[in-house]
């Protein structure tokens, strides 16, 4: 019997297999209508991997994942795999997934300090590009504890301090890095920028302090000018004695002196030491008001009324609000009494009246037409005094 060679037998077997294979329809091919979706399920050709892998839906991908992240591998190998995965995400600018991968690598708690330092530094970079500068700074700080001379961590930390406007710290980190490599361009550029911003910030702080001191001095001078004129502020109407008023009131008044009222007016003093007040005029008949932003203390009421009512206001439909017809009052709220102010009086004369109290550093007066029915009704039942 003639013996057949092994190769001939193999070839004959393969030929018969191929003949049988060709005669049978192929059942594992793509469907024409959805071949792109099926193609995307092949791990090699996936454009984006799913965030959660279902073994039933993607068995091939689940198999690959189990191989890559085999828990039986050493912590160092697993951490290195997560580092590489994070790097791939980082290159794709998918910084959130990169952070997750680096975090998983750190969770392996491998014994390699250099690898852990790289994981911290890389995660810091991803956090930085996400705008999480504080988290990024925490990571590079952890990296430097493991590897003090890690230049990339130092550069990233300096950048974080710069973004957080910690300019002094940014300069310090740059100086520490330049001790390792005095020619590192990134550190040199960062230091120059941080130092410039630090000097600008320090200058602005000095200017702000000088401005605050100047304002405080001006406010103290204004407060002394008010007290020298025996003008009573509203807090003094609460029955406080002079000492408690000067203690408790000063802070309140100084705050008010530094603030503008809603219309932007503020108590001021001229070169001769004379005061100008923001003064509010109320017209209860029509629920209207006027604010004189700078009523000089030596000016008379009639002088302002002549200007304010030189033309008839739009709301004065009866055209009765003429300077000669107007009466000016201030109210003593404690006693529920009114005081009629002579138009020829100066503002200072009225403010020095023993029953006048200035509220919110803005003197307020009521104005109405003396001969009108509204004025008679408004004054009915009220005790009215005449200011002399």
Curated annotation (Swiss-Prot):
Gene3D superfamilies: Tetratricopeptide repeat domain. The record marks 152, 156 as: Essential for interaction with HSPA8. InterPro entries: Csn1/TTC4_wheel, TPR-like_helical_dom_sf, TPR_rpt. The modification Phosphoserine is found at residues 51, 244. The keyword Coiled coil does not apply. GO terms for cellular component: cytoplasm; nucleoplasm; nucleus. GO terms for biological process: defense response to virus; innate immune response; protein folding. GO terms for molecular function: Hsp70 protein binding; Hsp90 protein binding. Keywords: Acetylation, Antiviral defense, Cytoplasm, Immunity, Innate immunity, Nucleus, Phosphoprotein, Repeat, TPR repeat. It is found in: Nucleus; Nucleus, Nucleoplasm; Cytoplasm. Transmembrane segments: none annotated. The modification N-acetylmethionine is found at residue 1. TPR repeats lie at residues 79-112, 117-150, 151-184. Interacts (via TPR repeats) with HSP90AB1. Interacts with HSPA8, CDC6, TBK1 and MSL1. May act as a co-chaperone for HSP90AB1. Belongs to the TTC4 family. This is Tetratricopeptide repeat protein 4. The gene is TTC4.
